[in-house]
Every structure is written in C-alpha cells, then in structure tokens.
C-alpha cells in the first residue's frame, strides 16, 4: 500500500465495519513489538526493507496502532516520531513504484496527458522533462502555500508536477492527515483497548532512549488566550440570547477548566480534585473569565438567569451549588469540551475556522496543538546522544 489514507485503504477499512471495530481488531492482528519496530526506522533506515512489501492489513494495523497510541498524547515528540517513521516508509514505497496511480494516494491529482503543442519544447527546456501529474492550483497552494508558482508550469488552472514534486507535496498532505487521524481517534480514545496505552508507553521509552531525556505531556498552567481557538475567542466576546447558555455554561466552562487544569486528561471521568489541590485555581483564575464573558452577552447572562452560576459549577463537576468546596468535586460529571461538530450544530455563529482548525476536531486539541507548535518553535536545538539534532528540528 502506498498511502494509508488513500481510497484503497478506506475500502480495506470498510471490511472491518466502523473505525471502532478496526481499532478493536488491531490487538489481534499485531503485537506491541510489531508496532514499535516500525518507528525504529527513524534510528536505523536499514530496517525499512521489512516494511516495503508488507501485507496491506498488517500495514494498516501497525499504522493505526500508532495513531491510536497518539490519541492519548496528541501533540509532542511522539507525534513527530510517528510522522517521520511513516514518511520514511511510505515515501520509499512511492519512490520505488514505477507508476503512481492517482487513486493510490490521498491527494487529488490527475495524470498529465495534454499539453499545448507549442509549450512542449519549452517545458522540456525549462523543467528538464515533461511533468507527469497535475493538480488544482487551490489544492497545491493549500498544501505548500510558500511555493512560488513561477517555478511550475501552469495550464488551465492546474499545476503540472514532476514525480519528485508529487512525492514532496504528498508528504505535506500525509503529515496533515496523520494529525487529522489522531484527532479523530482522540474523540473515541476512552473506548479504545488498553493495548494503545502500552504502545504509547513504548513510543515514549524509545524517544527517551534515542534523545537522552524524558518527554512529558503538556501540563496545566497559566492560560494562553492567544492560542485559544476562534470559537472560544468568539464566546469570550459575549454572545446574543439564544446561544448564551451553550456558549458560556457548556463550551467556555469546559474548555477553560480543562485548558487550565488538565489539558490532556488521562480519561474522560477525571475529577477536578484529581488535578488540583486548591479550588482558588477555579475561583480566582477560571470563574472570573467566565463571568466577564457572561456579562458581555446581550442581555448579560446572570441578570435574567442568576442561578446559572450553579449550573456552571455543575458542569465543572461540583454538583448544582453556588459555593462548593474542592471535596465536592465528583458530585457531578466534569463536562469535557464539546467537539467541533457539536459546536457547529448548537452555536454555528461561534464557528469561524482559521488555518489551524483544518487539523482538529475539538477546541481543546486546537489549544494543545498551538501550545505544542509554540514550544517547538522556542525549543533550543540540542543534540541527542548520537550528535544528531533533535527530531523536533528536523
């Protein structure tokens, strides 16, 4: 298989039923050791040969096992390792394939079959050889926005690509699809078998061994509003009657509390008191932001619904009360932030996607992604035990 996100791969997955069914079946198809062997190509590319002619089901099972593991830690060195290892494997398969058929990869390309007669010689002179593939300019710029179109032959709204161009642009789509796949599984991670947590542990152990230090998950801490998703920023500005309760009590309360206290919870039934020791984190850091946003609503939420503050505490997991103690945590469910689909359905006015939204399915993973990218941008370029640059900078 050339691409685990291709139509061919999707057809194979359909044979298992739903994605949940496939994820349940994976532990019966591959072992943890099988899966971890796949990421070892990052350390030793000589291992790649064993993955080049793999059975399609085995290949998909190993790949999705890694994505399932990442659903518990969606942004960090683990993601970079999984991306890099699989790019090595699938890129090599593409390079060795005599003819890449458009339906075998996950980007929308066509075989280049027509050229204006007067352009053929010019194309050969300028580009060295006749391009083999074409794609829409809009799709091209979406994947490689910094590329100069002047470096490519353009005809009737399509960019013409040589084989090496195709593989390079495909790699950008592949990385994006990996993140999308992880975010999809993030929504069902509480339903996944324990197998995937074991895979994650082995990925983290490999990273620690390879890079000489332990990589932890993103922890709770001071909120970074500049990295909030658009829906949260819109809710903070205040909203009109009709979506006030959803925007403030459901969305903002859940997002701010998890983002500040437990941005990457180990499970969905976690309680506030499992994560903090002082309720003032809520009363002094989170609640004032919620109240300010509620007061910006039209009309202000608490003017005509003063008891809604009790509902906010209820959604934080303290039960329906106005003055809880930390020990009351667990009297109700600490609501997890709704996913993007639910936000669009209940409060479409809040959903104004930006360029980062294309990767995610939940506002909390948006925040995790932005924090991760900022950390990667500011990380010092330190060498690992073998004198290589850290993977984060490769």
UniProtKB/Swiss-Prot annotation:
UniProt feature coiled coil, ranges: none
UniProt: [4Fe-4S] cluster binding residues: 231, 340, 351, 357
CDD domains: PriL
Pfam families: DNA_primase_lrg
InterPro entries linked to this entry: DNA_primase_lsu_euk/arc, DNA_primase_lsu_PriL
GO-annotated molecular function: 4 iron, 4 sulfur cluster binding; DNA-directed RNA polymerase activity; metal ion binding
Keyword Metal-binding carried by entry: yes
Keyword list, A-Z: 4Fe-4S, DNA replication, Iron, Iron-sulfur, Metal-binding, Primosome
Gene Ontology biological process terms from the UniProt entry: DNA replication, synthesis of primer
Gene Ontology CC terms: primosome complex
Cofactor annotation: [4Fe-4S] cluster
Record's keyword annotation contains 4Fe-4S: yes
Membership in a protein family: Belongs to the eukaryotic-type primase large subunit family.
Assembly: Heterodimer of a small subunit (PriS) and a large subunit (PriL).
Alphabetized HAMAP family for the sequence: DNA_primase_lrg_arc (MF_00701)
Protein name: DNA primase large subunit PriL
Organism: Pyrococcus horikoshii (strain ATCC 700860 / DSM 12428 / JCM 9974 / NBRC 100139 / OT-3)
């Amino acid at each position: 298989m050339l691409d685990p996100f291709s139509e061919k791969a999707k057809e194979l997955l359909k044979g298992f039923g739903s994605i949940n069914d496939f994820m349940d079946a994976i532990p019966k198809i591959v072992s943890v050791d099988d899966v971890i062997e796949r990421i070892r190509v990052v350390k030793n590319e000589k291992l790649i040969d064993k993955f080049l002619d793999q059975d399609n089901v085995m290949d998909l099972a190993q790949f999705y096992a890694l994505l399932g593991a990442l659903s518990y830690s969606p942004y960090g060195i683990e993601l970079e390792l999984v991306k890099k290892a699989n790019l090595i494997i699938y890129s090599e398969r593409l390079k060795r394939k005599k003819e890449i058929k458009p339906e075998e990869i996950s980007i929308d390309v066509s075989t280049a079959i027509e050229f204006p007669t007067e352009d053929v010689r010019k194309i050969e002179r300028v580009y060295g050889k006749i391009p083999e593939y074409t794609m829409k300019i809009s799709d091209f710029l979406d994947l490689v926005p910094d590329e100069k179109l002047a470096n490519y032959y353009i005809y009737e709204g399509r960019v013409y690509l040589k084989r090496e161009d195709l593989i390079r642009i495909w790699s950008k789509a592949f990385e994006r699809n990996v993140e999308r796949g992880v975010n999809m599984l993030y929504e069902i991670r509480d339903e996944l078998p324990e197998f995937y947590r074991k895979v994650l542990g082995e990925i983290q152990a490999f990273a620690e061994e390879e890079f000489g230090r332990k990589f932890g998950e993103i922890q709770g801490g001071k909120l970074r509003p500049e990295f909030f998703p658009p829906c949260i920023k819109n809710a903070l500005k205040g909203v009109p009657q009709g979506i006030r309760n959803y925007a403030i009590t459901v969305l903002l309360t859940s997002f701010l509390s998890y983002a500040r206290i437990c941005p990457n919870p180990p499970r969905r039934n976690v309680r506030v008191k499992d994560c903090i020791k002082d309720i003032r984190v809520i009363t002094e850091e989170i609640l004032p932001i919620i109240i300010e946003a509620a007061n910006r609503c039209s009309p202000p939420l608490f003017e005509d619904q003063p008891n809604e503050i009790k509902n906010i505490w209820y959604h934080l997991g303290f039960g329906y009360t106005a003055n809880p103690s930390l020990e009351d945590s667990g009297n109700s469910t600490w609501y997890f932030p709704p996913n993007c689909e639910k936000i669009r359905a209940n409060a479409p006015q809040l959903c104004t996607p930006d360029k980062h939204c294309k990767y995610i399915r939940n506002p909390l993973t948006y925040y995790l992604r932005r924090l991760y990218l900022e950390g990667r941008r500011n990380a010092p370029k330190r060498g690992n035990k073998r004198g290589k640059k850290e993977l984060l900078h490769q």
